[in-house]
């Protein structure tokens, strides 16, 4: 037993020890008392008691010490039994302790400077620092925003947080309205603007997934992302075909990455490879041009990654190989469109630099047609992997500029592979993800059992209003019950009239399902991990200090995408240019 525990034990038992010493004087008084019977003995005890107490020191007579020990031990036993059998009362929280949060509850989580916070509601904010003075107040910056159509997900939450301008931003922009309204505000504050537009490829910068392949594992990641987001909405087919496609994609992309010139490392080359892969069911010995290319490569580099993958694919019989090629052709059909081939010919987005300096990347997508949304999902997948690797390999684990992904209409971009693992690990790298949904069930439809893991890694959850039953039921359960006071009255009339009043306590939902369904349009509910929930007003965009730079304030502030892209210098492979040092 260490000294601290010994000291604590002595302090707790000191009162009983003192009572025992005092009781030795009682034993001495009883011993000095005279009497033939018990009545006389008791009467004499009270006469002898003052004599025994005149001596402040305890009596060390064996009989007196025994009485002292019995009294001290008896008192300790009585206290122990009393405490063990004590009734546990929780006044005013008998049926639940739920309540709405107050300004005092959120105060420890707010940074002194307004611009150093994530805006959650009109009155609640969350500091951007991942290392507050008190570690107990540390929360990740992942946010789940749920609100039905017209609840103000963009106006009341996404735009105000974009205007905070404390990080680099990756913004999913349905219809392309956010960049038009906020783009100039970001430019005026020194941001680098990048745009990828799947609605109109003519108004888009170029994105080439092949530009971010640096190793064999990157090839497999790209193939996994491609397959996950081009499988369609129908019933899943035989897993054999998916694995066979994976082998062929890995082989062809591996060849392109390691053997083709840089200007040919893109999806256009991959499509040309597939087009050249003729298969004859009645002639197993037939070799197409791609077979000959891999045969030549095998002679030079027999252990080449692409060769190993291609040899496994070639184990398939002619009819099977033809089916695999048809599946690949159907999956890559969007890349037969010339605009798609052009926009993926080379890369301008430089995804791995978003954590180096303040940058805003707008991913414009259609909210009615999901044909090309798989490209957005591929960007997010590569973005997370690239930034995590750069944080670990270059910056010692933390990016110099925080990167916030504001993913509006999350359900429309397709599945981001391993998102449940990413949201749990990106915090330490100075990356955060904000998922905007119309209903919680959308997330479960895409990520199945992993949806709960994703939600569990969102320290902040905001409900802006909606009527989807599953969302309302789960929020109702999460808010809990409060204890309320009720009273009943009784009034009996007749020959002997009487009146009664009865008070009692009951448990009531802090917000019932029907109350959540009719939530005031100006209100929202915030849940912050470890803190009581808040019923607050939505943030008013017009009150933001940077609102005056947006086109919502003045139409002259509109960001012209076409003009912005036309002013940029476009360099292609093979172009000659002269670099002039301005210094």
Where in this protein do the model-derived segments appear?
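A short glycine-/small-residue-rich loop at the edge of a beta-strand within enzyme catalytic domains
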Residues: 109, 114, 374, 410, ...
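Basic- and hydrophobic-enriched, low-structure N-terminal and domain-boundary segments
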Residues: 1-151, 155-158, 481, 492-493, ...
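Conserved long hydrophobic alpha-helices within structured protein cores
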Residues: 114-116, 120, 374-382, 475
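General secondary-structure edge motif
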Residues: 98-100, 125, 141-142, 308, ...
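P-loop NTPase motor domains
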Residues: 24-28, 136-431, 446, 505-506, ...
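Conserved ATP-driven motor cores of ASCE-family P-loop NTPases powering translocation/secretion/packaging/pilus
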Residues: 423-525
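Low-complexity, polar-biased intrinsically disordered regions enriched in Pro/Ser/Thr/Gly
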Residues: 126-132, 231-240, 262, 485-505
């Amino acid at each position: 037993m260490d000294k601290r525990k010994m000291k604590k034990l002595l302090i707790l038992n000191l009162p009983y020890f003192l009572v025992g010493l005092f009781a030795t004087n009682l034993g001495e008084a009883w011993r000095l008392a005279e009497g033939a019977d018990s009545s006389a003995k008791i009467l004499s005890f009270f006469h002898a008691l003052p004599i025994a107490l005149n001596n402040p020191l305890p009596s060390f007579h064996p009989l007196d010490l025994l009485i002292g020990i019995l009294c001290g031990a008896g008192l300790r036993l009585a206290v122990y039994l009393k405490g063990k059998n004590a009734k546990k009362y929780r006044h005013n929280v008998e049926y639940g302790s739920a309540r709405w949060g107050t300004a005092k509850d959120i105060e420890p989580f707010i940074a002194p400077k307004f611009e150093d916070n994530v805006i959650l509601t009109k009155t609640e904010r969350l500091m951007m620092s991942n290392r507050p003075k008190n570690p107990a107040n540390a929360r990740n910056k992942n946010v789940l925003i749920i609100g039905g159509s017209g609840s103000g997900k963009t106006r009341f939450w996404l735009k105000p947080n974009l205007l905070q301008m404390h990080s680099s931003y990756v913004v999913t922009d349905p219809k392309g309205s956010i960049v038009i309204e906020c783009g100039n505000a970001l430019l005026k504050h020194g941001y680098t603007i990048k745009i990828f537009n799947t609605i109109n490829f003519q108004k888009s910068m170029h994105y080439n997934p092949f530009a971010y392949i640096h190793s064999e594992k990157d090839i497999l990641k790209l193939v996994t992302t491609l397959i996950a987001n081009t499988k369609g909405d129908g019933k899943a087919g035989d897993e054999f075909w998916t694995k066979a496609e994976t082998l062929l994609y890995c082989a062809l992309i591996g060849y392109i990455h390691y053997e083709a010139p840089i200007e040919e490392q893109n999806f256009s080359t991959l499509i040309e490879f597939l087009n050249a892969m003729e298969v004859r069911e009645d002639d197993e010995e037939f070799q197409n041009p791609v077979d000959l290319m891999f045969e030549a490569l095998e002679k030079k580099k027999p252990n080449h990654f692409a060769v190993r993958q291609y040899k496994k694919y070639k184990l398939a019989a002619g009819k099977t190989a033809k089916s695999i090629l048809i599946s690949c052709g159907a999956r890559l059909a969007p890349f037969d469109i010339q605009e798609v081939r052009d926009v993926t010919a080379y890369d301008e987005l430089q995804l791995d630099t978003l954590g180096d300096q303040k940058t805003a990347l707008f991913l414009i997508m259609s909210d009615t047609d999901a044909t090309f949304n798989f490209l957005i999902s591929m960007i997010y997948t590569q973005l997370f992997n690239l930034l995590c690797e750069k944080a670990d390999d270059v910056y010692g684990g933390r990016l110099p500029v925080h990167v916030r992904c504001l993913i509006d209409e999350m359900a429309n971009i397709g599945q981001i592979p391993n998102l449940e693992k990413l949201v749990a690990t990106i915090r330490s790298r100075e990356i955060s993800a904000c998922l905007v949904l119309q209903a919680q069930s959308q997330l479960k439809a895409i990520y199945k059992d992993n949806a709960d893991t994703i939600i569990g890694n969102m320290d902040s959850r905001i409900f802006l209003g909606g009527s989807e039953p599953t969302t309302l039921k789960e929020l109702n359960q999460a808010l809990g019950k409060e204890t309320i006071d009720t009273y009943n009255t009784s009034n009996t009339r007749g020959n002997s009239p009487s009146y009664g009043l009865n008070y009692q306590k009951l448990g009531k939902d802090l917000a019932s399902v029907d109350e959540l369904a009719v939530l005031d349009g100006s209100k929202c509910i915030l849940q912050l991990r470890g803190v009581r929930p808040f019923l607050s007003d939505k943030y008013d965009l017009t009150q933001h200090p940077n609102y005056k730079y947006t086109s919502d304030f003045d139409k002259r502030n509109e960001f012209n995408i076409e003009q912005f892209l036309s002013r940029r210098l476009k360099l292609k492979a093979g172009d000659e240019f002269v670099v002039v040092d301005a210094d």
